[in-house]
């Protein structure tokens, strides 16, 4: 699939929604990704730029063309999720090679992210599909997926607040997506049918988006 949107954040939001995460889950995940990498798929952990002598661009290029051979074991966080542990970086690199994509390709990284969540972090993925608040989703990602050294209350608050900004922008109808060259504002409608709460994306024109799934929780 090709990513839809005018910016990395919009492309990431649309992609994750298309994979069945609910708006709270997407926002909570994106808040963490933003604090990790600024949503940049070529982001090299800042503290390692001087240590390794690379910028984001030169590191990515050197890994892609094979000039730099220590990507897996250099302990540097990389990409939108700042993958750091050697086995996860190894799997990321293998996935990129299988796809014939740059290690810094956004779509490839998003697909790999979903693969990780679907296989090794199923409990986190379940929260992202059923969360009832941004903070619930954000903490699930922080504590069980990203697992940074500092997981304290201040970090939890910061990441949840960052995620809330994405929720307010895209899930409340304040955001937009580009379709056939035109920006169309979207939002979410909620209804209770037979005791089941249903969310669905909508156009401001009132037409439903057929390619986005219903979310039940």
What kind of feature is each model-predicted range?
Residues 31-36, 84-86, 144-145:
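Active-site-proximal beta-strand/loop segments in catalytic clefts of secreted hydrolases
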Residues 193-217:
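N-terminal low-complexity segments that are often proline-rich with Ser/Thr-Pro
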Residues 2-7, 11, 37-129:
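Peptidoglycan-targeting cell-wall enzymes and recognition modules
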Residues 25-29, 79, 109, 137:
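Residue-level detector of well-ordered alpha-helical segments, enriched
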Residues 1-39:
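Export/targeting segments at the very N-terminus of extracytoplasmic proteins
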Residues 54, 140, 144, 205-206:
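Segments enriched in small hydrophobic residues
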Residues 1-4, 181-183, 216:
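Short, intrinsically disordered N-terminal pre-domain segments
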Residues 89-188, 192-193:
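Non-catalytic cell-wall polysaccharide-engagement segments
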């Amino acid at each position: 699939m090709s990513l839809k949107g005018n910016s990395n954040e919009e492309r990431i939001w649309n992609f994750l929604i298309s994979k069945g995460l609910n708006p709270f889950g997407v926002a909570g995940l994106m808040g963490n990704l933003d604090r990790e990498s600024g949503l940049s798929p070529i982001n090299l952990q800042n503290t390692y730029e001087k240590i390794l002598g690379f910028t984001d661009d030169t590191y990515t290029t050197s890994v892609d063309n094979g000039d730099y051979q220590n990507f897996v074991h250099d302990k540097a966080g990389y990409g939108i999720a700042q993958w750091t542990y050697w086995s996860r970086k190894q799997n990321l690199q293998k996935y990129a090679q299988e796809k014939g994509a740059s290690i810094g390709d956004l779509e490839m990284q998003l697909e790999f992210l979903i693969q990780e969540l679907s296989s090794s972090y199923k409990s986190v993925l379940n929260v992202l599909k059923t969360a009832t608040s941004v903070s619930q989703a954000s903490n699930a990602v922080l504590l069980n997926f990203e697992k940074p050294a500092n997981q304290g209350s201040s970090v939890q608050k910061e990441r949840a607040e960052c995620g809330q900004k994405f929720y307010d922008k895209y899930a409340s109808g304040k955001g937009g997506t580009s379709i056939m060259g035109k920006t169309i504002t979207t939002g979410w409608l909620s209804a209770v049918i037979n005791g089941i709460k249903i969310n669905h994306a909508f156009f401001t024109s009132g037409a439903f988006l057929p390619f986005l799934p219903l979310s039940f929780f």
